[in-house]
Structure formats: structure tokens, C-alpha cells
Amino acid sequence: MPNLQGRVAFVTGGNAGIGYHTVVFLAKAGAKVYFGARSASRAEAAVERMYRENPGLLHGQVNWLQVDMASMKSVLAGCDKFRASESKLNILIHNAAHEGREPSNMADSGVQITMQTNHLAVFAMTQELQPMLRTAAAEKDSDVRIVNVSSNAPSLTHSDEWRPDFSDPHGGDIRYPAGQADGFLAAMKRYSVSKMAMNLLTAELQARYDREGVPIMVISVCPGAVYFKPQVDTENVEEMMRQPT
């Protein structure tokens, strides 16, 4: 990890799992880190643990903002609070995700909660924070990055020939990704389609920066199989692995 003194980072879903440890590593490298979380109690407990287990962190180096990626209103409010606190953003990591369940749960954006959390909120937050990312990119020796935490799930749930339908904003895979069926496999397909959308956004955003000559790197990464207690469901994982892709 390079020295990140003077850099500002934002990590969504930073109170647990991959997000938690991402916040810690960035802060230990010297960055000032903000993370988004839905629950105040869990966020405050996470901050307390970070400082307790890493006594070298400076006061005010780790901060949290109430951001629920399943709510567009919450995403926009969180961006407003972040802009009120900082003038630039060097590192934006979209880590928060929805696992694909609750097929009938619609977000305030009018789309199913999985697509809202894993794609639309990512798009909205990135656009809202564009000026701050570009401010950081204009600095000498800038190394601005947008990292989208994705998944290899699409390769497990869909064939190479399958194509999502993103053509109709009022239906298809934007509003109801991969249909409205319930159950574990349907949830995995829903999750996969939302991650496909995230990957397409990643590629398009990088292409636009390149055309403009803006020195910002945008990447999607698959962290691999990571133990995270709320996700562990041995019976359903075994069921998924028995299914042909």
C-alpha cells in the first residue's frame, strides 16, 4: 500500500466485512477515510473498534456518514454531507451491495432494491461526486481511482450468450433484474444482472475519462470468496453449485 497522506477516500458499506478492512487499510496508509453505513449503532461500533485495534490512527482520520444505498434519497443526502466536509475525493470504493433477495421490494427510485443498491446508487453517487474527483485528478501526481466491488457471479448464473435487457427503464432488467421470481437461485440471477450493469458502467465511465484526457482510473474487481457471516448459507450454496450454468 503506498503512502496515502493527504488523500481522501470514501468507502460504501464500511462498517463490516470487506468494507471494514478496506477502511482500516486506507487509514493505516495515511488517508482520511469516510465510510457509508445504514445503522448509526453499527457504524459507531465499527469506528470504535478501528481506533481500538489500530492505535496509530489519528483523531478524525476515520469518519462515517449515514448512507443507505437502497435509498436514492439517502445517497443524495450522504453526498451533500460529504461535500460539506471535503473539497476533493481521491479514492471512491463502491463496496456496499444487496444480495438479490426481496424481489418485490422496490426502492424510492422505482426499481427493485438489488438494482438500486448495486447499480443505480453507484451511478448516482459517482455522478454527484464528479467535481470532487476531478478536483483531485487535477492535482500534481494525482492517482484518483474509482473501484467497484463486483463479482464473478454472472459466469455462474448465466451463459455467455445471455444478454440483459436494459432498454426499457420501466421494465426489463433495469426495474426487475432477471425477473420477479423468489428463491435462492433467482436471487443469485438478480444479483448477477445488477453486477453486469455495474461492470458496464465501469467500462463506459473509463472510456469517457480516457476520451476527455481525465487521469482517473475506474476498475471493477472481484474479491473472490470471502467469509462474511450474513452471507453464509451452506445449503443454498450447495444447491447453486449443483445447477448447470
Swiss-Prot record:
Pathway: Mycotoxin biosynthesis. The active site is at 150 (proton donor). It holds the Pfam family adh_short. Keywords: NADP, Oxidoreductase. InterPro entries: NAD(P)-bd_dom_sf, Sc_DH/Rdtase_CS, SDR_fam. Disruption phenotype: Leads to the loss of pyrichalasin H production, but accumulates novel cytochalasans. NADP(+) binds at residues 18, 42, 68, 95. Its EC number is 1.1.1.-. GO terms for molecular function: oxidoreductase activity. PANTHER family: RETINOL DEHYDROGENASE, WW DOMAIN-CONTAINING OXIDOREDUCTASE. Short-chain dehydrogenase/reductase; part of the gene cluster that mediates the biosynthesis of the mycotoxin pyrichalasin H, a tyrosine-derived cytochalasan that inhibits the growth of rice seedlings, but also inhibits lymphocyte capping and actin polymerization and alters cell morphology. Pyrichalasin H is indicated as the responsible agent for the genus-specific pathogenicity of M.grisea toward crabgrass. The first step in the pathway is catalyzed by the O-methyltransferase pyiA which methylates free tyrosine to generate the precursor O-methyltyrosine. Belongs to the short-chain dehydrogenases/reductases (SDR) family. This is Short-chain dehydrogenase/reductase pyiH. The gene is pyiH.
